[in-house]
């Protein structure tokens, strides 16, 4: 027999961002607990609101299965001493089964007698096992916790009630002074408490008390109501998934409504209005049918439609107060010339161990000028870069960014446009911060891409130079995000940048032109290069390359992210080709021979020492590949496919480790040339070949 089991934790209002994760945690911990205790079930459904975390275990077995089995113990000669007394081994064996030595009997197995016991145990009732739900609640973790009363216990918010029903039977789980029963609470203002006759009554009973316990159903209600409202007015709304999730977890009974504000505020940049509405008030911004932001917003009330006019008026009043502040900041900032703000950056600390923001910008310009030449950026774009690198952080000291820190770069773009900076310069100010997350948008302009890379590269160099290097668990200055941003932009632009090769030149250029500490030696420079190169692995994982392909390409000495990605594409593309296995096996054989011989010297090859035509053929083939300076990774692989029979013939026709030392070293030098070329693709020995 099976029954459904309902368990609800009723709390004070929880922060919206923890609700979904917390109910999932409750379900996962319960699932593990039930499996460990041998209680079978069909599935676990979750319900959650700001005031409750609930699970419904479907078709839970009413008891554990009875145990009726024979357990084998130690051999008789170990279970008893020579006088027939029970040893500690025998006593430990029966103790583990909950039995005594009187229960032991012996049977022969393959010529040896062993101790056995016949274990018969009635399974525990589910109601007894479910009393352990209190331990599950105690074990739950949260980003922040609260204590209440005099209890030595923490939870996300104080617990006021619990429901624990196995079918129609109360399982009186106790936590602190709260004993679980069958009474749950409806909406704080619209509903009453409700007594549940059965676990299956939960969802419908709460609906009668203005609580939609199913989060997906609440989300669907919100979306449907928004769509109805939008259709009535010919509006458009961009549904932000994060905001939708948040408002879903802010309400128990959603009612969508629309409000408005004076059109005069539309002179403020859209991003300011959207931030005021979305981030501060949890409103959805509204657009007309042409995609232009208009003076309306959509919000969600935690309740029904009664007195909705009062709710709308209250929300409009709060928003207008915020927009008045934004208008004031916007007007104040426009009173001053750009130079007024730029000059202030001399007194704004980038970091107390690194210097001012103005010094950071100066270093960024040096780095960008150097990289611009490497990337063949046009003279016109370099002129724009030099201009924007002089000013791009100016909005940090504006009133608007002081109030809305998340708009740094965005406000710089708008203010730059207002004073007549060209579009390349204006947009690059905003794009210097891109990408703002692992999946964030990348710069759309060459100048923006160059500025963003230079900014991030200086940040990494400066913090590493000052000894503030991220640990495996701590990265307070988001240096990994900066490094990953560099990699993503390089790949997006198709810019070749062998990090380890250019760092010494860059640091030399910066020396003497900054008060910030710089990496002091080649080891420190290599640490930075490896840190950035490690982010290439992240990109390869995002693009879902096979793990062995990733391991292979990252084990090469290649420093250029573009070339590493090209190698991954090539190896992945040809992985299932008929000629892939023989090519990889030939090249791996070369690597293994060189390792065994401990041969690393790049000696010149003496053609006069060749003793077989196969040596001449390999020499010519490798030279042809080496001399093609524009050879792509894809073409290099094709070259090795064509060269594979030549390599095989070389092995068949020559004793590599010849008795003649000169001949041996000459042949090893030949193989080293091949190996160095193959290393451009990766360490092929790491590939899994089927």
UniProtKB/Swiss-Prot annotation:
| Entry GO CC | cytosol
Q: PROSITE patterns recorded for this chain? A: AA_TRNA_LIGASE_II_GLYAB
Its top-level enzyme class, in one word, is ligase
Record-level Gene Ontology MF annotations? arginine-tRNA ligase activity; ATP binding; glycine-tRNA ligase activity
Family per UniProt?
Belongs to the class-II aminoacyl-tRNA synthetase family.
SUBUNIT field: Tetramer of two alpha and two beta subunits.
Question: By its UniProt entry, which HAMAP family does this protein fall under?
Answer: Gly_tRNA_synth_beta
Protein name listed in UniProt: Glycine--tRNA ligase beta subunit
Annotated source species: Lactobacillus johnsonii (strain CNCM I-12250 / La1 / NCC 533)
What gene codes for this chain?
A: glyS
